[in-house]
Amino acid sequence: MLILSRKTNQKIFIGDSIELTIIEIRGDQVKVGVEAPRSVKIFRQEVYEEIQRENRAASDSPWSPNSLPQLPV
């Protein structure tokens, strides 16, 4: 893991298209601004972990399309 120290308003660049800006430092909390292409998915850790849990639960579900009633055509 690369560890970098930054002060307020300083930036970190990741590749050519992602820019992180330290917006504010207050106590043990840091506000970070992220500029990235829309195609880059960015999640807070707790949100990402919840998405992963939901995906695992959905894939473990015994549901199948065959369990739906047939609609008349």
Swiss-Prot record:
Listed Polar residues bias regions: 61-73
Coiled coil: none
Cellular localization per UniProt: Cytoplasm
Gene Ontology BP, a term: regulation of carbohydrate metabolic process
Primary residence: cytoplasm
Entries under InterPro entries matching the protein: CsrA, CsrA_sf
UniProt keyword terms in alphabetical order: Bacterial flagellum biogenesis, Cytoplasm, Repressor, RNA-binding, Translation regulation
Family: Belongs to the CsrA/RsmA family.
KW Ion transport (keyword) present: no
UniProt subunit comment: Homodimer; the beta-strands of each monomer intercalate to form a hydrophobic core, while the alpha-helices form wings that extend away from the core.
Biological source species: Treponema pallidum (strain Nichols)
Function, as annotated: A translational regulator that binds mRNA to regulate translation initiation and/or mRNA stability. Usually binds in the 5'-UTR at or near the Shine-Dalgarno sequence preventing ribosome-binding, thus repressing translation. Its main target seems to be the major flagellin gene, while its function is anatagonized by FliW.
A GO molecular-function descriptor: mRNA 5'-UTR binding
Record-given protein name: Translational regulator CsrA
UniProt GO cellular component terms: cytosol
Pfam families: CsrA (PF02599)
